[in-house]
Regions:
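Conserved donor-binding/catalytic core segment of Leloir-type glycosyltransferases
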Residues: 10-13, 203-227, 233-239
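A short, glycine/small-residue-rich beta-strand->loop->alpha-helix junction that serves as a flexible
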Residues: 14-29, 225-227
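A charged, aromatic-enriched C-terminal amphipathic alpha-helix characteristic of glycosyltransferases
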Residues: 26, 338-389
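Conserved active-site histidine-acidic residue motif and adjacent donor-binding/catalytic loop
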Residues: 70-73, 251, 259-276
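Short beta-strand->alpha-helix junction loop in the catalytic core
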Residues: 112-114, 146-148, 167-172, 187-208
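Nucleotide-sugar-dependent
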Residues: 284-296, 311-319
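Short hydrophobic beta-strand element within catalytic cores of glycosyltransferases
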Residues: 302-310
Length: 391
């Protein structure tokens, strides 16, 4: 338990470590590893979790639960293996609200989706959701725009009027947090003008494997409409994703979706590398709509898989295998299938060369620290001998 009487800053996320749904957890893990240790004011990580029985039981697998009957801090849910103080918003908000209230500064590392989900279940207004954080927001990092993600899925899926209203609330809530943040940060590759800073994610190519001699298509991503999983209906493929979501997500699609030859490899964060090391797939379905960064794209390239990219992803990069429709995607699979291993390796090397601009962990770290370690006009970075000003 932290000393609430000493100065500390709060950083809020929704995923970390084994509690993972995708790219946000990877970003937070990198933040904990590379940024947290260089913060000049003690950091406290808050993990927002949906407060229902299912989530409580899920999270209990990975955290320590400390019970102090009769105390003001009765329950403490924490992941002890993390190198910084951390607390989960379970079994209720009492503990984390107390920590947030006493913080010197308050930063959002990602969009707090669980608050929106809980608020919608209670039919809260956007204004009431915002009041969960009864304080100034010093910075907010955005990993994807709800306005783009939700509007895209509305093209494919049928929703009730009530559900569409909830989605609009999510768009409005995210926009409110961006507007209220003293500093807003976009983590994507392409510039979004509504943000104060553009600090793209980082991925360091460490494997640089040769191309895999297989024409099976791999899908290493979540089952959500903008990932365009339905492009694989007629393709020999394997998907590293949630089987439960896969079995249910297409029920309300406007057009029938039927897969002829797809294997589902159940997603687990501890099996990510194992999936990429499989040699029975060599083409990566990386054709995602509105993809801000795309860890799975970088990972596919790192592990020797030829990606099929969306036409709008990293548009300045010359690359022939791109698509926006299922028909175009199938055509690109056929084109890649004709390539020799030598040609595939040439494409992979060119991709790695261009994307190397996003591999500097130190640059990424220092750009974030220039925000978190700022006090007035003074900033301390790890290259300095000592903090420029005591805070």
């Amino acid at each position: 338990m932290i000393n609430l009487n000493e100065p500390y800053d709060v950083y809020v996320a929704t995923e970390v470590g084994d509690i993972s749904n995708g790219g946000v957890s990877k970003w937070v893990d990198d933040w904990v590893k590379n940024v947290a240790s260089h913060l000049i004011v003690k950091p406290v990580l808050i993990i927002e979790i949906e407060q229902d029985d299912g989530w409580v039981e899920y999270v209990k697998q990975f955290v320590d639960v400390i019970h102090r009957p009769g105390s003001s801090w009765e329950y403490e849910y924490t992941m002890s293996q993390l190198p910084i103080a951390n607390y989960f918003s379970l079994p209720d908000r009492k503990a984390v609200d107390m920590v947030i209230k006493g913080a010197r500064k308050f930063h959002l590392l990602s969009y707090p989706l669980p608050i929106m989900m809980y608020g919608n279940s209670k039919d809260w207004s956007t204004e009431k959701m915002r009041k969960i954080y009864k304080r100034k927001i010093d910075s907010v990092c955005i990993h994807s725009l709800e306005s783009e993600t939700l509007k895209y899925q509305q093209k494919f899926r049928k929703f009730t009027k009530k559900s569409l209203g909830y989605q609009q609330k999510s768009i409005d809530f995210q926009n409110t947090l961006i507007k209220d943040g003293e500093v807003s940060i976009w983590i994507g590759l392409d510039n979004e003008k509504q943000f104060d800073f553009m600090i793209p994610n980082v991925y360091k190519f460490e494997h640089n494997l040769n191309a895999v001699d297989s024409n099976v298509v791999g899908f290493p991503a979540r089952c959500e409409p903008r990932k365009n999983l339905h492009f694989l209906q007629n393709i020999n493929s394997v998907a590293f994703t949630s089987e439960v979501t896969f079995r249910n997500i297409f029920d309300d699609y406007k057009k029938k979706v039927k897969f002829n030859n797809i294997e589902i490899d159940e997603y687990r964060v501890d099996r990510i590398e194992d999936f990429y090391k499989r040699t029975d797939w060599g083409i990566s379905h990386s054709c995602f709509e509105n993809e801000p960064f795309g860890y799975s794209i970088f990972q596919s390239i790192d592990f020797g898989k030829i990606p099929i990219l969306h036409k709008n992803w990293c548009k300045d990069m010359e690359y022939p295998f791109r698509a926006t429709t299922q028909k175009q995607f199938e055509k690109q699979v056929a084109e890649i299938s004709k390539l020799s291993i030598e040609d595939r390796n040439t494409y992979l090397n060119n991709l790695r060369s261009y994307l190397s601009k996003y591999t500097s962990v130190e640059k990424w770290r220092d750009e974030l620290l220039s925000i978190y370690n700022q006090d007035g006009d003074q900033i301390w970075l790890p290259t300095d001998i000592s903090p420029s000003k005591s805070v």
